[in-house]
Amino acid sequence: MLQIDHLTMHSLQSGRLFLDDFSYTLRPHERTVIIGEEGNGKSALLKYIYDPTLVEGYMECKGRRIVSREILGYLPQSIDEEEKKVPVYAWFCQQDGFYDMNPSSLGAMAAEMGLEADFWYQDRSFGTLSGGEQIKAMLAALRIKKPTIYLLDEPSNNLDLDVLAWLEKEIVQLPGAVLFVSHDVHLIDACATGVIHMEQLHRKNHPRITVADVDYETYREQRFAAMENQREKAVSDQKKEKLRQQKLQRQYSSVDYALNHISRQDPHGAKLLKKKMKSIKSTEKRYAREKEDMATLPEEEESIVIELSGAPIAPGRKVLELKNYCLKTSDGTLLCPSLNFAVYGPKKIAIIGSNGAGKSTLLRQMLDLLRQAGFQTGYMPQNYAEVLSPEMTPIDFLAPHGDRDSVTVARSWLGSLRYTSEEMTHEVRELSGGQQGKLLLLKMALEKDEVLVLDEPTRNFSPLSQPVLDAAIRNFPGAVISVSHDRQYLGTVPDVIYRLDENGLVEYSGFIGEDR
């Protein structure tokens, strides 16, 4: 059993409180998801549970973590660059329990996970594996370790649709308990039996954490119903309070006027009026006490606000056309010998395909062609470090010239995406993945782009922010070319979905999400 006792967690740099006296018990075989807005401390909590030393450089934590007789397995959101250089076989040799596995057991596991039989012994570097292969390798390493509790941080990032379907089944079937962070609504719906919801209220000055032993859909419904009931009761109570205060004020004014104008020759009448005034003041005090118990409007975490206004593109205008295009990687590896594709007008295009098919490579080459053609083009890469320097601040990125007007506009936009004043001056390296993604969105909003090229745009956005992001991209007046495996995004945003493989781009007509 995993137990957290009275945990308080706050940032060493900003002093912001992320958890306040949080207690929680993860029982055997539970599948609990941690959700919340970007930068609310979800990954930090998961790291603390696995090993408190992982966060001691930037978080101060007080409380108890009890993991008696439990074996913890941790899947990080990403692995560091040095680890990516290690050959696959050497990487597995570093994992607990690998030397105890016999070839037949490894072969059976490879078949079960959809991997090549000799996957474990390959000499290519770990970083050359596709996103799906990396996740499978890390999950395999966890299974070899045989933990009793699995801690998974955004396990669905960078996975294609086929691997996502596999991952959902894998999480459900894992032995032991699972505590995971995810933004993928479909994954959460399929796997979670409980919810931990981390929120930051009052402009991120007050943390609130909600634990619910129900699936995510039920949690959303119960949360919405409870807030609506509280809102209705609060409005009703406020209306009743206003009416009775008005009545009390009329009574007070009437008696006060009578007291000021009563004749001295009527002492009995004055005595009755004073008695009535005393009763009114007593009622006023009673009302004040009762008001403390009245329902208040429900407190909700402020949602993000984003609009990608952009520059409109006329329907029918050719944006990009590829004819018999040969798709190769930067080192000359052939991915597709002949590719045909065209985008016209303000179309919203999404590209899907297996990990390693070349989607990100194609997207970068499309970006170059669009800019060569003179289109003002915004770009969100899968790896934010391609465009974000780790030393710069959000203000530096959005207002590089540093003039007062540009800085004022940048601060206003950052505030609309729930950045605090302190976060606006933090270095990019200190921001969460979601906060970095928001920076790229703001850059596109400020530059009035004609075309957006987006590689996994929703990958670091919470289930609560994603509908806002989806709507912003859908309502963008220009063209959008995106790569995504997010089923909610694919079901709501693109006009057309293409699948990329070695034969080219083919329009995809399969069922994805809830709206297709």
Place the predicted regions along the sequence by residue:
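ABC ATP-binding cassette signature C-motif
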Residues: 1-229, 314-516
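Flexible nucleotide-interacting loop at or near the entrance of a catalytic core
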Residues: 227-334
